[in-house]
Structures are given as structure tokens and as C-alpha cells.
């Protein structure tokens, strides 16, 4: 099939590594957008970081919703390629893009119109809320770029051409790195400058994707971006992508509640520590997400082609690699949490509280890697419900656990322990679930 790679033959370890590395690098680039903003906005002070952090919860929610079509494309297009059905692969690609555009316009409009009442949830000082509202309204107008780029990335990943999204996203990151200090400090625009820099970078990434997909060597031989939706393809995409998007979106809503609790217990410093710490923790999350996505694509093609032995070997190899990296991240956060946090927010009180977050969260990093790797296995098999059940159940347990620990007098640390403990549970439960059903499906 034109513009695709056959992953059902050849050395498994090398294929997994060459597929996962660009995806992981792309995830790091997407994370670097936030880290770049944090590194510069942090120089404005903890209040500015709190404003950007509050909006960060909502942009995380947006990215979670965008997973509907990223995962939907990776699995539906990937399985169609594995089954040698070129027509279905193209139709799934077109439908994912169309659905992504519709959802992004509706969601972006809601955030723009209701920015202030949404951000009032965090109960921040009025001037911090005002800055956050302006930031959110700018960011919300760029959501179609994010959603469509996610769908484009999923299509390329499904085709085994994960290097292309990496190069395109890298271009956007370089642009963001250049524009951030220029807009924030050079023009004196502060947090507004950070929002505009990110908006322009995301628009550039979208434009390059469109240019590549309209070129002569387009993936899948080219396909329409906007099509009338057909029930057959739409239902399959929602069946695959909706559980993933739901679990990540509900996860974001849980974090919104925990962010408010952090604000109540520790003021804007507590909120800043939680949101900024979560972005730093993305070092682990994005690494595992890269391997998980690569594993999902590999399994989707091989499972559809009946190559079950390759599926099992790929799972074992990926679990070993992510386990090693997760252990290293645990050591970094546990022993050097404050030092890492101070890179982004140099205020003493900020990196003291933030260092506590990273230390406590560090105990769960290996288990986070386990959970996200297992998500990739289930997604590649077309079974997206089990990860959703485990993730939603454990994530919502964070709320009563956090409230209980707060009631016991643990203060803002209660939230950190609730997050860490439930992350351990998710990794263990999802791995055990797969081990129990492995013989039946493989």
C-alpha cells in the first residue's frame, strides 16, 4: 500500500524501536511546548505560573478529547493496512479528520465563551483569573490546529511513518522556543505572549501537515480531508477512540478538582506545584506514551494479520524497556525533585512545595509506565474498554482518598499521595487483566 510500512515481517525489536523512537520524540516535542512556556513564564513569578497552570488543565482536557481521533486513526487505519484494505484505510483517515474538525470547533467555542466561569472554579485572586481568561481565549481559537494535527499524526503512525510527525512537530517547537522569549519579554506581552507564541507554532505545524498530505508522496496515496460521515466508519472510530478519550478527559476533570483542592490547601503555590509538577512528570508519561503508541501500531497490524507470536514478543520487549526507564525517572524525582522543579520556577517556596510533589510522585513512575504500555497492547488489539475501566475507576478514587487524607491533616501533601497511590494501583491492575486474558486472545 502506497506510503505505508509493513510491520508484519522483519526483526521485531528493531521495528519496535524505530517506530517508537520518533513517536516518543514527537511526544517530547509536544511536552516541550509546555515546558518552554513554563521555563519563561516562571521568570514572571509564581502567580503567572498559576494562571498558565489553571489553563493547562483545560488544554490537557482538550488534548484528551483529541485522542478520540488520534487513537481512532492509529487503530482503524493500522488494522485496515494490516488487512490489506486500502479503501477502508483511506475512508477511516478521511472520517477521523472530519470528526476532529467538528469536535474541535464546538469545544473551542465553548471554552472561549465560558472562559471566566470555568476558571472561577479554581478560586484564584482576581488578577490571576483575569490573566488566565485572556490566555485561555487565545489558546481556544487554536484548538482546531491541535485536533487536526493529532489526527494527522495518528494516520502517519498507523502507516508506520512516525518520523514525519516528529520532524513536523520539531519545526513547531523550534518556532515556539524562538517566539516565547521574544513575545514574553522582548515585546513585554507576558502570559499573552506565551499564548500567542504557542498559537503560531501550532498553526505552523498544521500547515506543514496539510502540505505534506497534499504532496505527490502522500500517505495512503492521498485521501479527502472532509467527507460526508458514514455510519460504518464513524461508529468504528467512536468505538475505538471514545473509551480512550473518555478516560483521559475524565482524568483531566479529576485533576481539575484536585487542582482546586491544591489551591484551597496551599493557595496559588499549591495550584502551581500541582500543575507544573504534572508537566514535569510528563517526562515519564510521554516516554511511555511513545512506546505505547508504537506498540499499539505494531500490534494492530500483526494481530489483524494473524501474527500472534509477534504480538506477544513485542509486549514483553516493550515492558522491559519502559520498566527500566520508569525506574530511572523514579530515582530522579525522589532524590532530585527540588532541583528539577527549580529549573522552571526559581522561587524558594515554589520549588520546595514542588519538590515534595515530585518526590512523592516519584514512587509511582515505574507503575505509570506499566499502565500506559498496557494501554498500547489493549488498543492495538482493538479492546479499548479495559484500560478505560481501570483508569476511570482508579482516577476517581483520587478524590475521596485526597479528601480523606486532607481531613487527617496532611495538607497539600494529601493530594500528592492520593495521585501516587492510585497510579501504582492502575499499573498493577491493568497488567494483571491482560495476563489473565492473554491465553484466550493470543
Feature annotation, model-predicted:
Residues 1-23, 77-144, 186-242, 299-364, ...:
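Short alpha-helical transmembrane segments in multi-pass integral membrane proteins
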Residues 18-37, 138, 149, 172, ...:
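Transmembrane helical elements of multi-pass membrane transporters/channels
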Residues 28, 32-50, 119-126, 182-189, ...:
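Helix-terminus/linker motif at the lipid-water interface of multi-pass membrane proteins
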Residues 29, 33, 62, 66, ...:
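Residue-level hotspots within pore-lining transmembrane alpha-helices
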Residues 46-57, 136, 195, 268-283, ...:
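Small-residue hotspots at the loop-to-helix junctions and early N-terminal turns
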Residues 49-109, 146-165, 273-331, 335-336, ...:
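Small-residue-rich hydrophobic transmembrane alpha-helices
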Residues 61-64, 176-181, 206-210, 282-286, ...:
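Hydrophobic transmembrane alpha-helices of multi-pass small-molecule transporters
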Residues 70, 74, 138-157, 165-173, ...:
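Short runs within selected transmembrane alpha-helices of multi-pass transporters and secretion channels
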Amino acid at each position: 500500500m502506497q506510503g505505508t510500512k509493513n510491520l508484519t515481517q522483519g526483526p521485531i525489536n528493531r521495528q519496535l524501536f524505530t517506530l517508537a523512537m520518533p513517536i516518543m520524540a514527537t511526544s517530547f516535542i509536544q511536552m516541550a511546548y509546555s515546558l518552554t512556556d513554563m521555563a519563561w513564564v516562571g521568570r514572571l513569578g509564581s502567580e503567572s505560573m498559576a494562571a498558565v497552570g489553571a489553563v493547562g488543565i483545560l488544554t490537557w482536557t482538550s488534548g484528551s478529547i483529541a485522542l478520540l481521533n488520534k487513537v481512532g486513526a492509529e487503530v482503524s487505519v493500522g488494522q485496515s493496512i494490516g488487512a490489506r484494505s486500502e479503501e477502508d484505510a483511506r475512508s477511516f483517515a478521511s472520517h477521523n479528520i472530519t470528526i476532529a474538525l467538528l469536535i474541535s470547533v464546538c469545544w473551542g467555542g465553548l471554552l472561549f465563551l465560558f472562559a471566566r466561569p470555568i476558571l472561577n472554579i479554581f478560586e484564584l485572586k482576581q488578577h490571576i483569573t483575569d490573566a488566565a481568561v485572556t490566555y485561555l481565549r487565545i489558546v481556544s481559537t487554536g484548538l482546531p490546529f491541535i485536533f487536526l494535527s493529532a489526527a494527522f499524526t495518528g494516520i502517519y503512525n498507523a502507516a508506520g511513518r512516525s518520523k514525519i510527525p516528529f520532524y513536523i512537530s520539531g519545526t513547531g517547537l523550534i518556532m515556539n522556543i524562538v517566539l516565547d522569549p521574544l513575545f514574553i519579554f522582548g515585546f513585554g506581552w507576558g502570559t499573552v505572549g506565551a499564548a500567542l507564541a504557542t498559537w503560531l507554532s501550532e498553526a505552523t505545524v498544521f500547515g506543514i501537515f496539510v502540505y505534506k498530505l497534499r504532496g505527490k508522496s502522500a500517505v495512503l496515496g492521498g485521501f479527502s480531508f472532509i467527507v460526508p460521515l458514514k455510519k460504518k466508519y464513524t461508529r468504528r472510530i467512536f468505538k475505538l477512540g471514545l473509551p480512550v478519550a473518555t478516560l483521559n478527559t475524565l482524568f483531566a476533570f479529576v485533576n481539575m478538582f484536585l487542582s482546586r483542592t491544591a489551591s484551597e490547601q496551599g493557595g496559588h503555590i499549591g495550584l502551581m506545584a500541582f500543575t507544573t509538577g504534572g508537566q514535569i512528570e510528563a517526562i515519564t508519561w510521554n516516554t511511555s506514551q511513545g512506546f505505547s503508541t508504537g506498540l499499539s501500531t505494531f500490534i494492530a497490524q500483526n494481530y489483524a494479520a494473524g501474527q500472534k507470536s509477534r504480538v506477544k514478543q513485542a509486549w514483553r520487549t516493550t515492558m522491559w524497556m519502559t520498566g527500566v526507564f520508569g525506574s530511572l525517572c523514579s530515582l530522579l524525582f525522589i532524590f532530585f525533585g527540588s532541583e528539577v522543579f527549580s529549573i522552571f520556577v526559581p522561587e524558594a517556596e515554589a520549588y520546595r512545595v514542588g519538590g515534595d510533589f515530585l518526590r512523592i510522585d516519584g514512587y509511582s513512575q515505574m507503575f505509570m509506565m506499566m499502565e500506559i504500555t498496557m494501554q498500547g497492547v489493549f488498543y492495538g488489539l482493538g479492546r479499548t474498554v479495559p484500560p478505560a475501566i481501570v483508569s476511570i475507576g482508579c482516577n476517581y478514587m483520587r478524590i475521596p482518598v485526597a479528601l480523606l487524607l486532607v481531613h487527617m491533616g496532611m495538607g497539600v501533601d494529601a493530594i500528592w499521595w492520593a495521585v501516587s497511590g492510585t497510579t501504582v494501583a492502575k499499573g498493577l491492575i491493568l497488567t494483571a487483566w491482560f495476563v489473565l486474558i492473554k491465553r484466550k486472545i493470543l
